[in-house]
């Protein structure tokens, strides 16, 4: 019960920041459309050029690896860039300012080189772990999963470090690991669960909305079923956007607390309790 209570307090604290600057939710929206542009830029030309057929036939494996790696890099870059913009804007709010979308984009733009470098590092780690996982057995996949989880913990604060301290991507990873170890130990606690709460909400929407949609469709209310299905889709999108925004805000608040020992919107004891000491 204490974990559930802490999780809810985290959501409410992040929610207060989001209410103060509702435009922060625009960053995940822009990031989504930018990611779709990256997908279209890579896959549509390859599809029409017949590259996929050659890769599946085994005649262009090297080309497939190169293109796949480049795709990973640019997709990571888009994600990190707009997440950096979100975190940068959230930092302004946490420091008592009143940020705008242009403020966040400006901050991310000032560190575009470091963000791209970090995207290259993250893409490299991701491809290596994925390649090993595909060739490993069940035990090996478990080990790779643990390594991936450890990597996510070690890089938890990289984005705010890049946009606030202006260091390079390698130093950003090192600094992130140092801050987590110094302040909370090396492992995230299970009660850090904004993702869990929204996962449950999304599951509930899918379960209830899906059931209602099926019932109305079976009963012959076709247009009502279509309307319900669209409503479920819109609700899932909204929940996803809010969850992404809250996670970015929480990351900024954790960084602020890790470096200053305080945070305007978060109770320090609550933030501490979301991590377990080693």
Set out the residue ranges of the language-model regions.
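Hydrophobic alpha-helical membrane segments
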Residues: 1-278
